[in-house]
Amino acid sequence: MLMLVFRLGDNRYAIATPAIVTVLPRVNLQSLPGSSPAVAGVFRYQGQVVPVLDLNQLLRGAASSALLSTRIVLVNQGAPDEPTRLLGLLAEQATETLESHQVEEIAERVDFCQSPYLSEMLVSQQDIIQQLQIYSLLSQQAYDELIAQAATVS
């Protein structure tokens, strides 16, 4: 399995590519007043309103930098038996991919009850990589609320 790797500060994270629809350059986002600081805003992709989460804000508590390597990773957050639910993930330094054979899963399990979107930890030749469980980033209800809010500010 192929994984997209990105860096936030000194830490590396990975998203499994089967969930990735495409990777886009950073675009201007329409803000949603009153939403969580982790919600960077919304944009239109092929006619559909897409909410965007700022992964740096979510994981480190600070907004993503406007780097040339900052990307919007467009993922399908819907489960395989659900309709497509596009979600944008603002990620810094999203410039690398790894094959699963290039990493080892750390055997010890860490309880991420406060952060259910953090999954297995992997070890590469360079360092430790934390996998993201994209299906746990945003509930269906929260997603629907963001889409409804976007409709009122459009």
Regions found by a protein language model. Name each.
Residues 1-154:
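An acidic, low-aromatic, low-complexity terminal/linker signal
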